[in-house]
Amino acid sequence: MDRRSRAMADSVLSLNKLDVGFPGMTVVRDLNLDVADGAFVSLLGPSGSGKSSVLRTIAGLLPALGGRVLLEGQDITALPPERRNVGIVFQNYALFPTMSAFENIAFALRVAKKSKAEVERRVGEVAEMAGISDQLDKKPANMSGGQQQRVAIARALVTGSRVLLFDEPLSNLDAKVRAAMRKEIKRLQSELGFTAIFVTHDQEDALTMSDLIVVLNHGKIEQIGDGRTLYRKPATPFICEFIGVSNELAPPLAARLLGYDVKGRSFLRHEDVLLGAVAGVPARVNHVEFLGAHSRVDLEVEGHALSAMLIGDQLPEPGSTVSLGIRPGAAHVFQEVTG
């Protein structure tokens, strides 16, 4: 058994050479991904990268153009959504406004013609797990955003789904509520033990919640890894630009700062630019922007723009000259391959 086959055998969900899209238009081609049981995996990418199309193909809402979707080793590629045993939590939770929380959670069970006793038992079980047993008589309008989120997750779990798909459920929330909801979803996932596939365009969502992040760009995987790996060891220039905030160094400036010629592209994160360095490069301070926990300093170095992130109140004055250096080993260099 080769490495890929072993990974698929050990995974609760596998995408094998999956082609995703619409008739006449392939959005994602030849996607391979293995998701471990109980993992929290984010599909991260800009608009149009194909992440939501992948999620809908896993759910069966969008037919696969090629390849296979395997759930616990079983090929579910051709199965309709209701037979896939995966739950989905939509962007706006998609709760029925005229139904109580109990009725929302029970809906799929009643469609499946489960007995009244079984409906009450299973709804009661997932409601207790999700911490909403005391909310079951309420309608969505009378519940907080966090309570609605729990109802949506309970509804997705009540049919026995072990894999939950989240289609950008935080995208319409303000920053403070969004941060609270991130913690809530991650807590529920950890406590209930389900496998989560979470689609987002927001890197903060992915970095704070995920065991594994799959970065998509123009229908292809740029890199797969945990947040720390993506941030500190980016595999491509796109990752440098998309994850965190980086300076792209012009070749002459890269040569001056790194001490060797760069035939390609090089990047330096704002926090890795050091001011006040011994034997550094002279830099002019153009602008200082206070951002609360840190400040951004825009610099000009030998005609090239560069930005630094500083923490604390000791900030240079605009128009002054500072000595600039870089954190050793912090630059990300992608040399051109010649051949």
Swiss-Prot record:
Origin organism lineage: Bacteria, Pseudomonadati, Pseudomonadota, Alphaproteobacteria, Hyphomicrobiales
Residue intervals of the ABC transporter domain: 13-243
Protein name per UniProt: Uncharacterized ABC transporter ATP-binding protein y4fO
Protein's membrane topology: Peripheral membrane protein
Compartments, as annotated in UniProt: Cell inner membrane
Xref: InterPro entries: AAA+_ATPase (IPR003593), ABC_transporter-like_ATP-bd (IPR003439), ABC_transporter-like_CS (IPR017871), ABC_transpr_FbpC (IPR015853), ABC_transpr_MalK/UgpC-like (IPR047641), Mo/tungstate-bd_C_term_dom (IPR008995), P-loop_NTPase (IPR027417), Transp-assoc_OB_typ2 (IPR013611)
Residues annotated as binding ATP: G45, P46, S47, G48, S49, G50, K51, S52
Keywords tagged on the record: ATP-binding, Cell inner membrane, Cell membrane, Membrane, Nucleotide-binding, Plasmid, Transport
GO cellular component terms, A-Z: ATP-binding cassette (ABC) transporter complex, substrate-binding subunit-containing
One example GO MF annotation: ATP binding
Family to which the UniProt record says this protein belongs: Belongs to the ABC transporter superfamily.
